[in-house]
Design a protein with these regions (language model features):
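N-terminal domain-start motif of subtilase-like serine proteases
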Residues: 2-12, 79-92, 112-149, 169-179, ...
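Autoinhibitory propeptides
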Residues: 4-14, 43-124
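Short glycine-/aliphatic-rich beta-strand segments at the starts of folded cytosolic domains
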Residues: 14-24
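Structural recognition of the beta-strand scaffold that forms the well-ordered cores
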Residues: 20, 76, 147-149, 189, ...
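Solvent-exposed loop/turn segments at secondary-structure junctions
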Residues: 104-108, 153-156, 171-172, 196-197, ...
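Subtilisin-like serine protease catalytic core
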Residues: 136-167, 175-226, 241, 267, ...
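Extracellular S/T/G-rich loop segment that most often corresponds to the catalytic His/Ser-adjacent loop
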Residues: 151-153, 290-366, 370, 376-381, ...
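C-terminal subdomain of the subtilisin-like protease fold in secreted/lumenal serine endopeptidases
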Residues: 203-206, 232, 236-248, 255, ...
Length: 401
């Protein structure tokens, strides 16, 4: 579980030792395999095309030196120092390889608890976040829209979701989908929780959306880029209109692999939404947008307090291409579901802002029929302007249609 007295938001970026290889859009499966097999030490190459959509999981990495995610056009390779030199040489001369980058450890983006604000309060009927985003006055519920939440899993025994159809898959080796952390259950609750919980106020946005849970972070709250890429491939293959990722690494330079994946997801009709990061220590240190949110093709979300000012931890935009904040949403003192027996919990972070936006995106997808880039633009067009710098909130506060 998360200890609210201990920050879990800002960690030096750690590398796993593996490499992410981004291929050109028009490269064939055969060209990708040939490029990888030309690398010294890469003898076996697995492909997501070799398994069913339901079977894509952590075991795909266990028997091969490299794995290709065909829909994403990305490979993950486990290479040593000698093979790395060979891989770099292959990338220099092979036109189907766009980039070779280190794989990073990613973490759930939750921060410390803060004193309650007074502008908007959780009421008897709904949370302050749903009030601020006008969800409570919206008649839509996201019915017919598939929303994928890639996080620490979900408490499948939670009584607020009894009878709800939930499609789930773990991408963490040795762990099932059941959430032993809490972060994922909280994010699923905010994005897709019930309209009328039996015992407490409403906390979920798209109460009628179809829930897809991809466990990409362990019960300790950490994972790898490979876990995320595998789950993104799974979500896109399952026709999810929205992917919500309340996770990241403090990497200021955009990762080419995520830029390509976000762009290819939009083309496939999937909007990817990610937490901007919690590395700010305002007012002195505004922080920066981390990966994967700092890709221009992934919607980056900043966090607001109940007085609709910036949450003190929420990262600010940076001058690098892709380092902008696109939109903002409630992220401080957010009440939502939590694994039993606790049932509910209040935590803070850009992680909590992100599922608000994901749920609202599902409402726009339902009301407009738009997908991909068109859905992105509809979501931005529906924002409420704020008297805050664009570097902090982008277009403004996400609001329901």
């Amino acid at each position: 579980m998360i200890d609210d007295d201990q920050p879990t938001s800002s960690h030096p970026a750690q590398q796993t030792g593996r490499r992410l290889i981004t291929f050109t859009d028009d490269s064939s499966h055969e060209e990708r395999v040939a490029a990888l097999q030309a690398v010294e030490g890469v003898d076996t190459v697995a492909s997501s095309a070799d398994v069913t959509t339901e079977s894509v999981g952590p075991e795909i990495f266990e028997t091969a030196d490299a794995t290709i995610f065909e829909r994403l056009g990305i490979a993950v390779a486990d290479v040593g120092p000698v093979a790395l030199e060979s891989l770099d040489a292959e990338a220099e001369q092979n036109p189907v390889i766009v980039a070779v980058e280190p794989e990073h450890v990613v973490r759930a983006l939750t921060t410390v608890a803060h004193a309650a604000h007074t502008h908007l309060r959780d009421g008897r009927l709904s949370t302050w976040g749903l009030q601020a985003t006008k969800v409570t006055t919206c008649p839509l519920d996201g019915s017919g829209i598939r929303v994928a939440v890639l996080d620490t899993g979900f408490d499948l025994t939670h009584p607020d979701f009894a009878g709800r159809a939930i499609v789930s898959r773990s991408f963490v080796a040795g762990e099932d989908v059941q959430d032993g952390h809490g972060h994922g259950t909280h994010c699923v609750g905010t994005s897709c929780g019930p309209k009328a919980p039996a015992t407490q106020c409403r906390y979920g946005v798209a109460s009628g959306a179809s829930i897809y849970v991809g466990k990409v972070l362990s019960n300790a709250g950490s994972g790898s880029d490979a876990n995320i890429l595998a789950a993104m491939e799974w979500a896109i293959a399952n026709g999810c209109a929205v992917i919500s990722m309340s996770l990241g690494a403090d990497v200021a330079t955009p990762v080419a692999a995520y830029e390509a994946v976000g762009r290819r997801a939009l083309a496939a009709g999937t909007l990817v939404i990610a937490a901007a990061g919690n590395n700010a220590r305002r007012p002195g240190d505004p922080g920066f947008v981390g990966s994967p949110a700092n890709s221009t093709s992934i919607l980056a979300v900043g966090a607001l307090a109940p007085d609709l000012r910036m949450a003190p931890f929420s990262a600010r935009a940076t001058p690098v291409d892709g380092g902008s904040i696109d939109i903002a949403a409630p992220g401080l003192d957010v009440y939502s579901s939590w694994p039993m027996p606790t049932r509910y919990h209040i935590i803070s972070g850009t992680s909590m802002a992100t599922p608000h936006v994901a749920g609202i995106a599902a409402l726009y997808a339902q009301s407009t029929g738009k997908r991909g880039r068109d859905l992105w633009e509809a979501l931005i067009a529906g924002t409420q302007g704020l008297a805050l710098p664009v570097e902090d909130v982008g277009a403004g506060l996400a609001t329901a249609p």
